[in-house]
UniProtKB/Swiss-Prot annotation:
Family the entry assigns: Belongs to the class I-like SAM-binding methyltransferase superfamily. CmoB family.
Keywords of this entry: Transferase, tRNA processing
Protein name: tRNA U34 carboxymethyltransferase
A GO BP annotation: tRNA wobble uridine modification
Amino acid sequence: MIDFGNFYSLIAKNHLSHWLETLPAQIANWQREQQHGLFKQWSNAVEFLPEIKPYRLDLLHSVTAESEEPLSAGQIKRIETLMRNLMPWRKGPFSLYGVNIDTEWRSDWKWDRVLPHLSDLTGRTILDVGCGSGYHMWRMIGAGAHLAVGIDPTQLFLCQFEAVRKLLGNDQRAHLLPLGIEQLPALKAFDTVFSMGVLYHRRSPLEHLWQLKDQLVNEGELVLETLVIDGDENTVLVPGDRYAQMRNVYFIPSALALKNWLKKCGFVDIRIADVSVTTTEEQRRTEWMVTESLADFLDSHDPGKTVEGYPAPKRAVLITRKP
C-alpha cells in the first residue's frame, strides 16, 4: 500500500500545512473509490522491490543510483522484472543499480533545455503539474530544490515514482499525489511551478494558467512548456478529432499568442526561453515502451506534418513571474 503519511507529516511543519485541511480527505476518497483495476498489481511490484540505499546518487546530471558493490545477476534481474511490470515507461531515463530504463521520452533533453533559463532552484519549494513518473522532480532536487511536489492523476505514474523513490533509498525530498490541479485549493505556497506538456490537454487553457498562478507565492516563477505552432500573436490551432493521434488536444497557440494569454492572466516578465521541434530521437519506441510513438504519428511522406496533416509537434518553453 502506498502511504502518504510521510508527506502529511512533512507539510504539517512547513508553510504547506493549510493543505492538510483538504488533502487527507481527498486522498482517502481516492483510495476508497477511484483506484485503477490494475493498481494493486502495480503497487505489489513496488512492494516487492528491495530496500536499497544508494552508495552513489547522481540527480544533478541524470537519475542514477549505484551500490558500493555490484548487485548480483539475480538481484538485477529481480529489479528489472519488477520495473518491467510497471511498463510503459514514458518519462526518464533512469539508471538504477545496473538496470537502465530507456523511456519513450528523453526527458533529460527537455531538462537540459529548460534548466539554463530558470531562477536558481536552491532551497525552493516546487510544484510539478502533470509530473508523469516524476523524472523532472528528481532533477529539480539535484539542482538544489528543498522540496518537489508532483501532481498527476495517472496511477501507473504514481507507482513508477514510488518504485524509483524506493530504489533511491526512500528519498523524501520529492512526493507525488494522484490529483489533478483542479483538485488543489489556491495554496499560493510554491516558489516555482512547472507545467510541462499539460496545457494543450486542457479544454480551457486560460483557466489552467489561472490555476497555476493560484499555486505560486508572490514573485514566484512559472515554467510553462507546451505545444506551439508558427504564427503571430493571433494564431491558434484548434485541431479536429485528433492531433498526432491524440484525441485530447484542444488548443495549440503560437508562442506569441501564449505570451498574450499569460499577460491576460496577470503574469509579468514573460520570456520565450526556447522553441524546439520534437524529434524522433527525443520521443521514440523502446524496450520499455513498446507501443506506437512519434514516428507513427507523423506523415510517412512528410515528417513536417502529423498523420492528420497538421504541423508536426513543436514545443516552446515560456518563463514568467507572478507579481
